């Protein structure tokens, strides 16, 4: 449950960094920073490389209830900054 993480952890759904999803449907970062179709495995790998201690949970984003999966990471600054760092790391890993 998200309330258990308040102040200590950040919940990340793949939709937050997906460039193919508009902001009205859940994207949180600018399209030029976001990445197309991020996979859970990529988010976990990027978070591990950034030292964020990722943990997978079988939960759905409310606007996309049919897609399961979210990642919980340690809070190290703002949520927006963390999302940008993860998106950039995934871009680097895809090269």
UniProtKB/Swiss-Prot annotation:
GO MF, one term, reads:
7S RNA binding
Q: Which InterPro entries match?
A: Signal_recog_particle_SRP19, SRP19-like_sf, SRP19_arc-type
Q: Which GO terms describe its biological process?
A: SRP-dependent cotranslational protein targeting to membrane, signal sequence recognition
> What are the subcellular locations of this protein?
Cytoplasm
Q: Which domain of life is it from?
A: Archaea
NCBIfam families to which the protein is assigned, alphabetical:
PRK00754.1
Recorded hits in PANTHER family, A to Z, give: SIGNAL RECOGNITION PARTICLE 19 KD PROTEIN, SIGNAL RECOGNITION PARTICLE 19 KDA PROTEIN
| Record text on subunit structure and interactions | Part of the signal recognition particle protein translocation system, which is composed of SRP and FtsY. Archaeal SRP consists of a 7S RNA molecule of 300 nucleotides and two protein subunits: SRP54 and SRP19.
User: What is the recorded name of this protein?
Assistant: Signal recognition particle 19 kDa protein
Species = Staphylothermus marinus (strain ATCC 43588 / DSM 3639 / JCM 9404 / F1)
